[in-house]
């Protein structure tokens, strides 16, 4: 993989390419690119529609995760925020590739099970971090409805993760195949 391939993929999306290229290239430095994945998607928040792009770059020693979000502001118009996480491969936890298929049965498939033709509907890449955790807290309580005591907090600590979902219908078959290829290459490098 070359920087020119990554540049073409980012510029081709037309979503703040200068910002994203500068963010990724400054974090990448002189390191070689083993693989990359670019995912562009709409986002929904309350009553607004936005755009988000994730760029994952696998190097021999790190996984770079660039997240760029569109920010709509009536006073300033459209702007964007971009951040890059640099995760050493040794700190990457589980790398999960999930494939969802519909089983299409041919008319004579009952006699020949090999005649089932699975049809890929969507694919997910889930990355779990070993070093980052998310803590969700909420006020603790008791079963006495009249109790006014402070019971502190209760919560759950879970590993932070990231999920990228693609489907042939939304992203195209070629992008889904690229996701599968990227995920399998990453799985082979994480120990």
Describe the residue ranges of each PLM region:
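Anionic N-terminal interaction surfaces
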Residues: 1-62, 66-72
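Acidic, Ser/Thr- and proline-rich intrinsically disordered linker/docking segments
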Residues: 72-191
């Amino acid at each position: 993989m070359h920087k020119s391939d990554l540049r073409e993929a980012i510029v081709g999306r037309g979503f703040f390419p200068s910002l994203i290229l500068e963010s990724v290239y400054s974090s990448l430095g002189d390191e070689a690119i083993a693989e990359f994945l670019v995912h562009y998607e709409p986002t929904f928040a309350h009553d607004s529609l936005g755009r988000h792009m994730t760029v994952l770059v696998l190097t021999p020693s790190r996984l770079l995760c660039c997240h760029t979000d569109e920010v709509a502001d009536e006073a300033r118009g459209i702007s964007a925020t971009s951040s890059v996480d640099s995760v050493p491969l040794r700190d990457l936890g589980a790398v999960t590739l999930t494939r969802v298929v519909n089983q299409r049965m041919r008319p004579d498939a009952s006699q020949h099970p090999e005649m089932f033709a699975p049809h890929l509907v969507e694919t997910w890449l889930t990355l779990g971090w070993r070093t980052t955790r998310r803590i969700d807290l909420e006020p603790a309580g008791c079963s006495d409805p009249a109790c006014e005591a402070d019971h502190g907090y209760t919560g759950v600590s879970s590993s932070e993760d990231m999920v990228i979902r693609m489907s042939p219908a939304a992203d195209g078959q070629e992008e889904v195949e690229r996701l599968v290829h990227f995920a399998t290459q990453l799985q082979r490098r994480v120990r």
